[in-house]
């Protein structure tokens, strides 16, 4: 009986070749799109480098400020540096808490040399504890660098190769919006699907005036927080 069904199916395919081709191509494309969507969701949800701790991380991307008496007077946005520090950096139960800026476009260049536009993120030193980057050379900027507001930078491999022609650039100087930064490390390129950690250049937010950029009585600003729990059960 199965042989008869197969023969009938083959006969119908031969009789209506155009319709058969359209149906097969449509089915293949539908399956392909479903696979792409599933893979994209998996990449954004599952633990993967550098966001290997997603299963025990809490992402605080925005906040809402509401007036105590005027209930219609409310606003939602990212938080200021002051708000992030007072609300989250004082926590003692988590393994680590990092405060980061949203991505910004910045001009990266060499004195008298090449230049390019890069995606830049400003972070604290705990960022390198929460996220696990693959360093090709060097290391991240330290807590001392951060607290001193030193102009240190970690760059991606593609930026290093584009500007210097090599990834062995630790100790060399790069200009970010015409300000000199010393490169402390080079990391493997990060996928844009790693939305919490993606950038091409990372610098301490204390090396800029980002802390002064706030509004709504210093509650809101350009910062986000990631809280790393000690276990996924926390």
Language model region names:
Residues 15-44:
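Short, strongly hydrophobic transmembrane alpha-helices
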Residues 70-81, 114-119, 147-151, 190-202, ...:
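Solvent-exposed, non-transmembrane alpha-helical starts
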Residues 2-14, 83-87:
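A short amphipathic helical element positioned immediately N-terminal to and/or at the very start
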Residues 13-16, 23, 44, 58-62, ...:
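Generic structural signal for small/hydrophobic residues in well-ordered secondary structure
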Residues 37-107, 220-224:
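Membrane-proximal extracellular/periplasmic loop immediately following the first transmembrane helix
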Residues 56-58, 118, 139, 172:
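Extracytoplasmic/periplasmic beta-strand context in beta-sandwich domains
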Residues 124-141, 151-234:
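Mid-to-C-terminal secondary-structure elements
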Residues 91, 100-102, 109-140, 146-147, ...:
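The feature marks short, hydrophobic/small-residue-biased sequence motifs that occur predominantly
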